[in-house]
Design a protein with these regions (language model features):
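Pyridoxal 5′-phosphate
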Residues: 4-133
Length: 133
């Protein structure tokens, strides 16, 4: 068995021992915490449902006046990694009238403190871009 196969088996064993129900509950709790915080931040627009039970640990959003690549770069300067761009979903973006977006995601290795840090830094994106709000 090659190292790649052993690593995959170890990851599967880890998740099976942990229990996917626990993984799902943790992911949902972090998503809920983040959604509730984002809804309080002006100029943030969540794309899709704001019901955490309808999400899979992924929140897609835009920020008024800020290109997603700029948002990702600014958040990266705070040590926060998000995705930006089309997310291989250009037809959906066109249908929604969204050229590009940001995407934050959470999983078992993320913490409430990391979500709170993201929510603390998210409003600074517009400030870094020169907006006075």
């Amino acid at each position: 068995m090659c190292i790649r196969d052993r690593a995959l088996h170890a990851a599967i064993d880890y998740l099976e021992n942990l229990g996917m129900d626990k993984v799902e509950a943790h992911e949902e709790a972090l998503t809920k915490r983040c959604l509730e915080g984002m809804e309080k931040i002006p100029h943030i627009h969540i794309i899709g449902s704001t019901d955490p039970t309808e999400k899979t640990g992924v929140i897609t959003f835009t920020i008024d006046g800020v290109h997603p690549h700029d948002a990702a770069t600014i958040l990266d300067s705070f040590g926060i990694a998000i995705r930006s761009g089309h997310h291989c979903a250009q037809p959906l973006g066109a249908h929604l009238g969204v050229e590009a977006s940001n995407r934050a995601s959470f999983y078992i290795y993320n913490t409430e403190e990391e979500v709170d840090y993201f929510l603390e830094k998210l409003p600074l994106v517009r400030k870094q871009m020169g907006f006075k709000d």
